[in-house]
UniProtKB/Swiss-Prot annotation:
One of its GO terms (cellular component) is host cell nucleus. This is Protein E7. It holds the Pfam family E7. Plays a role in viral genome replication by driving entry of quiescent cells into the cell cycle. Stimulation of progression from G1 to S phase allows the virus to efficiently use the cellular DNA replicating machinery to achieve viral genome replication. E7 protein has both transforming and trans-activating activities. Induces the disassembly of the E2F1 transcription factor from RB1, with subsequent transcriptional activation of E2F1-regulated S-phase genes. Interferes with host histone deacetylation mediated by HDAC1 and HDAC2, leading to transcription activation. The E7 terminal domain is an intrinsically disordered domain, whose flexibility and conformational transitions confer target adaptability to the oncoprotein. It allows adaptation to a variety of protein targets and exposes the PEST degradation sequence that regulates its turnover in the cell. It is found in: Host cytoplasm; Host nucleus. Keywords: Activator, DNA-binding, Early protein, G1/S host cell cycle checkpoint dysregulation by virus, Host cytoplasm, Host nucleus, Host-virus interaction, Inhibition of host innate immune response by virus, Inhibition of host interferon signaling pathway by virus, Interferon antiviral system evasion, Metal-binding, Modulation of host cell cycle by virus, Oncogene, Transcription, Transcription regulation, Viral immunoevasion, Zinc, Zinc-finger. GO terms for biological process: DNA-templated transcription; symbiont-mediated perturbation of host cell cycle G1/S transition checkpoint; symbiont-mediated suppression of host innate immune response; symbiont-mediated suppression of host type I interferon-mediated signaling pathway. Residues 1-47 are annotated as: E7 terminal domain. The keyword Repeat does not apply. Belongs to the papillomaviridae E7 protein family. Homodimer. Homooligomer. Interacts with host RB1; this interaction induces dissociation of RB1-E2F1 complex thereby disrupting RB1 activity. Interacts with host EP300; this interaction represses EP300 transcriptional activity. Interacts with protein E2; this interaction inhibits E7 oncogenic activity. Interacts with host TMEM173/STING; this interaction impairs the ability of TMEM173/STING to sense cytosolic DNA and promote the production of type I interferon (IFN-alpha and IFN-beta).
Length: 110
């Protein structure tokens, strides 16, 4: 390309017909290092780690929930302690029928 703007005459396309399909070597010629460097965990260690994760899922953890008041739409922040399974049940209630009322709207309706 010569000049500030390309023109169709300046564009040169070179097309080569490729009728032959060249074979590709898919064999990996990579060599592995010594297996002494690798740390192989026995199955009981892996199972123990999975057991720890499952136990952690059942323990009570503190979670912060942000929602809005169903009357005035003010932001509410709740802190609950629940297991992951129970927190999931609370999330399902939020999506279904559970509504929260802020303290100001709660005192006005009484």
């Amino acid at each position: 390309m010569h000049g500030p703007k390309p023109t169709v005459q300046e564009i040169v396309l070179e097309l080569c017909p490729c009728n032959e399909i060249e074979p590709v070597d898919l064999v990996c010629h990579e060599q592995l290092g010594d297996s002494d460097d690798e740390i192989d965990e026995p199955d009981h260690a892996v199972n123990h780690h999975q057991h720890q994760l499952l136990a952690r899922r059942d323990e009570q953890q503190r979670h912060t929930i942000q929602c809005t008041c169903c009357k005035c739409n003010n932001l509410l922040q709740l802190v609950v302690e629940a297991s992951r399974e129970n927190l999931r049940n609370v999330e399902l209630l939020f999506m279904d029928s559970l509504n929260f009322v802020c303290p100001w709207c709660a005192t006005e309706t009484q």
